Amino acid sequence: MRTMKLAPSVFGAGIGNLSKQLKILEENNVELLHVDVMDGHFVEKMAFGPDHIKMLKELTTIPLDVHLMIEKPERKLDTIIDAGADIITIHQESTTRLYSCIEKIKSHGVKAGVVLSPATNEDTLKYVLDKIDMILLMTINPGEAGPGFHEELLTKIKNVRELIGDRDIDLEVDGGIDNTNIAKCKEAGVNVFVSGGYVFKGDIAEKIKTLREALK
């Protein structure tokens, strides 16, 4: 049975209390910390970068799950790797060099994954399935935040889980994940759950507990 993993998104955290919030996440044994890197081109927003990843690496022992929402990620991979990313996921739509990007990431001992936006066909994964460690499925459009989980994408999640088969690949979902839909995602085949606003608004420890209860 696949291990269920929570990956709170630091994009939803309050920067002023970040150290305290990270400590609460550590105390509640979250498995990953999701970090969105945005360049203002692939998506309209800008958020985080190598310096922020390096800072987070110094502040927490939680492995960093870095989601690159940037154009031509091959130009930034060296700095992202050097900053301390433990997992790097890149959008299939963001580069014409997907295969070489994956190989470069893995050559540095970092786990590599592919991200699919809601409208991207999952068939593109077939060519890299034997090279990757993670698939991230967006259930909202990249760069958006807040509620908006699109339940019709559960079928796509099931299809991707079937493509994975018995390969050792984590299936991650990001976009509007909370206690009302996390179990449906698990049932569809997800084992890594990104949640930002839901986790960080209110009692963080209680929110983590609620998500874990919903996964039972």
Predicted segments with their positions:
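Catalytic cores of alpha/beta
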Residues: 74-82, 120-131, 177-192
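N-terminal active-site wall of soluble small-molecule enzyme domains
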Residues: 39-104
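Glycine-rich phosphate-binding active-site loops on the catalytic face of alpha/beta enzymes
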Residues: 88-97, 136-146, 188-208
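Conserved, mostly hydrophobic/aromatic
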Residues: 18, 25, 36, 80, ...
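Glycine/Thr-rich beta-alpha phosphate-binding loop at enzyme active sites
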Residues: 39-47, 51, 118, 126-158, ...
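Glycine-rich beta-to-alpha transition loops that act as phosphate-gripper elements at the mouths
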Residues: 9-14, 66-74, 94, 115-123, ...
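Alpha-helix-loop-beta-strand connector modules within alpha/beta enzyme cores
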Residues: 46-66, 104-113, 153-171, 211-216
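Hydrophobic faces of well-ordered beta-strands that scaffold small-molecule active sites
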Residues: 5-9, 33-35, 64-68, 88-90, ...
